[in-house]
Amino acid sequence: MVMSGMRRVDAVVFDVVETLFRLDAVADTLIGFGQDSSTLDVFFTRMLRDAFALGCTGTYRPFAEFADSSLAVAAPTLDDAQRGAVLSAFGELTAHSDVQPAFERLRSEGVRIAALTNGSATNTARLLDRNDLASFVEVVISVDEIQVWKPKPAPYRHALTRLDLPAGRVAMVAVHAWDTHGARAAGLVTGWASRLEGVYAAVFDPPDVRGAGLVEVVDGLIALAA
């Protein structure tokens, strides 16, 4: 074990959707309603785009509201009840296989764990519980608390406040390059796992640590010199 005084990172904050949890349940629900297998990507990409656009104009809407709006455009043949079922599937996500080993590795080193989501804290807490991960996570933080979406600096700084730690002692881990870029711009240490995007977009600030999966990333973060 590395002593805290010798380690750069004292806490790791994880993105939630796609970083910790798979979207298979949402995809399966869409396909069950006759949607094409590509609909999930169209929906999720549009949802992020719409959320970022609202953020750029200083407007905030909770996850359920803009997700429903984005889904109505991406899959216009779905009725209200079907859209509701698709959105409910966000509460049935399963964890990626590398999540628990990564959490166990951090706990073995005494590194605190938090989750930072653009969704709701309640749903995230339920996902952690249903996947037997809740005991690892000290705090679940939602952008709802400050009504500003990642990747603006405010959510990452809010996480620092909740953890009562300076930016240089906290790492943000995600599978989205835009998320690690946002965290780095806010002063946090960053780790990016390539299992979703494959290649890190060159327009973004590079992460401090990168790896194929979460275990490799957290190992790299633990190894960072103070």
PLM region descriptions:
Residues 30, 44-47, 67, 86-90, ...:
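Hydrophobic alpha-helical core bundles mediating ligand binding, dimerization, or RNAP-core interactions
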